[in-house]
Regions:
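Bacterial signal peptide processing site
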Residues: 16-18
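Short coil-to-beta-strand transition motifs
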Residues: 129-133
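C-terminal motif of bacterial Sec signal peptides marking the signal peptidase cleavage site
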Residues: 11-14
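Charged, amphipathic alpha-helical segments
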Residues: 71-72, 98-106, 137-155, 177-205
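Low-complexity, Pro/Thr/Ser/Glu-rich flexible segments characteristic
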Residues: 20-46
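Sec-dependent N-terminal signal peptides
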Residues: 2-9
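Tryptophan-anchored aromatic micro-motifs
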Residues: 42-107, 117, 121-125, 157-178, ...
């Protein structure tokens, strides 16, 4: 009897040891699996990141390169969007806290003869049915160069892709009721060509312009009250619209302005009226 009890106890101890060993082995396998899964996820992320196209970097230009850009090149055709005159000199934007449509027309942009950073601008704005003339200036204060592989061998006439930042002040006539001043920052992304010309760079969708090429971002300040309202306008309004108003554009192939924003002045976006002329006429 005593011998039987000893054998039973020995069997129970052996079973317990086996269970503990199996549990330890199971825990070890689970831990190893967690590590393996973690490494797999990390490896997948690394491979995913490696497969992404290289980021476009903005590099500060040398003082000499900055001087060359300002002195040798005239950026006024970019402000005027001269490649697609005349209607393209009109820029669309958002004004006020409700982001109602506003249009800005640049009638003339001239580079100052003595100060290569200074550009003089005249034009008109249209907000709802109010058309107001303005004049002012843009001052270019920084220039940067893109380090990018977007320049193909077919674009041998491109010297480089650049971005300039500056400030603007556009003053409405003080004698007019409800007049004020537009002021803020301006960003332009463009290419410098070997023939000393410039053109917009259409391949970029990073930084402030978001592919809009030319962006004025600031506020309008009332002369009378000193109160301000936000304003932003751009060459390619579709590029920034969705960051201002939710679902501003709809459609994949045939992109259009969302009808729900027609009440904010976007119902006649495609109408060809030369509102900036003293004697408006339909455009052909």
């Amino acid at each position: 009897m005593f011998l039987i009890l000893l054998l039973l106890q020995a069997g129970m101890i052996a079973c317990n040891r086996t269970s503990k060993n199996e549990k330890a082995a199971s825990d070890t396998l689970s831990a190893n699996q967690v590590v393996t899964d973690t490494l797999s996820v990390q490896t997948s992320k690394i491979e995913e990141e490696d497969s992404r196209p290289p980021a476009k970097l903005l590099l500060e230009v040398t003082p000499q390169e900055y001087q060359d850009i300002l002195v040798k090149y005239d950026l006024s055709p970019l402000f005027l969007n001269a490649e697609y005159k005349p209607q393209s000199a009109v820029y669309n934007g958002f004004y006020g806290t409700d982001h109602y449509r506003i249009e800005m027309y640049f009638a003339s942009v001239t580079k100052d003869k003595n100060d290569p950073t200074l550009y003089h601008i005249t034009g008109k704005s249209r907000y709802k049915k109010n058309i107001t003339p303005f004049e002012g200036e843009v001052i270019i204060d920084t220039a940067m160069r893109f380090s990018t592989s977007d320049i193909s061998s077919e674009n041998k006439n491109v010297k480089g892709i650049y971005k300039t930042n500056g400030t603007f002040r556009l003053r409405e006539a003080a004698k007019l009721a409800g007049s004020g001043i537009f002021e803020g920052t301006v960003s332009i992304e463009f290419t410098l060509l070997t023939d000393s010309n410039t053109e917009f760079w259409y391949l970029n969708e990073i930084d402030e312009t978001q592919g809009a090429d030319l962006v004025f971002d600031g506020e309008w300040v009332s002369y009378k009250t000193g109160k301000s309202k936000p304003i932003i306008w751009a060459k390619e309004i579709y590029s920034i619209g969705d960051s201002i108003l939710e679902d501003f554009t709809i459609g994949d192939r045939d992109v259009m302005i969302n009808p729900k924003y027609h009440k904010l002045g976007w119902d006649n976006y495609w109408e060809n009226d030369e509102w900036w002329n003293d004697s408006p006429s339909a455009m052909l």
